[in-house]
Amino acid sequence: MAGLDLGTAFRYVNHQLHRPDLHLHHNSSSDDVTPGAGMGHFTVDDEDNNNNHQGLDLASGGGSGSSGGGGGHGGGGDVVGRRPRGRPPGSKNKPKPPVIITRESANTLRAHILEVTNGCDVFDCVATYARRRQRGICVLSGSGTVTNVSIRQPSAAGAVVTLQGTFEILSLSGSFLPPPAPPGATSLTIFLAGGQGQVVGGSVVGELTAAGPVIVIAASFTNVAYERLPLEEDEQQQQLGGGSNGGGNLFPEVAAGGGGGLPFFNLPMNMQPNVQLPVEGWPGNSGGRGPF
């Protein structure tokens, strides 16, 4: 029965069962039992059960070797039980970790709101803050009341005027740079309004005592470049040619004590150079406040 088709056999048996002249009887006597009669009478339900059982064997892989056809289609069972490929649904919607910047750029400007308490020197407080934090401070504005103000007015031929009493701050601007910046790079300009409506202003050269809470709006930075303008022709040629100083002194003009001005340099505030920067070459140092 190796080449027997199950479908053809089923149709043949079904046709034989529906013949009126053919009847299958079960012989109960043990003497007439044939080798094939032990299965009982053959019906359509038995054929359906056999087909269903064989279909289950084919789907499950047919590893028991019950029939040649079931074993030949063993690979089809693997396709039925295989996991689907690709991402599981919803895997792309998982929350991503936030991006955290742990290091700040040296060229970043930071905004500050500085509050000076009553009785303190506003100029000295801001200068000390810039020196300890090793950051350059650019004062944008200020508000509050001050007393005992010493200012220098350009219209009075550099005379220093000391104002007694309480004054309201109208405008406050300036810059504070820690070393190695020269003292001339630090200055503070203020305009005040008196109790009788008078307005006076100038560069702060002495004490600027706060008569109450003084709020200073400022921005800070760490990367500073000092340059002397206008640029000379030889300096422009050196910059165009890539520079010819070699690996010698980083500040040749400063070390030699010449009056050519400060060369370009760009150093972090926490790096102290090994040379002394000239102070006399900067204008406005004679009438200003002393260094930090």
From Swiss-Prot:
It holds the Pfam family PCC. It comes from Arabidopsis thaliana (Mouse-ear cress). The PPC domain mediates interactions between AHL proteins. Keywords: DNA-binding, Nucleus, Transcription, Transcription regulation. This is AT-hook motif nuclear-localized protein 23. InterPro entries: AHL15-29, PPC_dom. Signal peptide: none annotated. The gene is AHL23. Residues 23-100 are annotated as: Disordered. Transcription factor that specifically binds AT-rich DNA sequences related to the nuclear matrix attachment regions (MARs). Residues 82-94 bind DNA. Residues 106-242 form the PPC domain. One of its GO terms (cellular component) is nucleus.
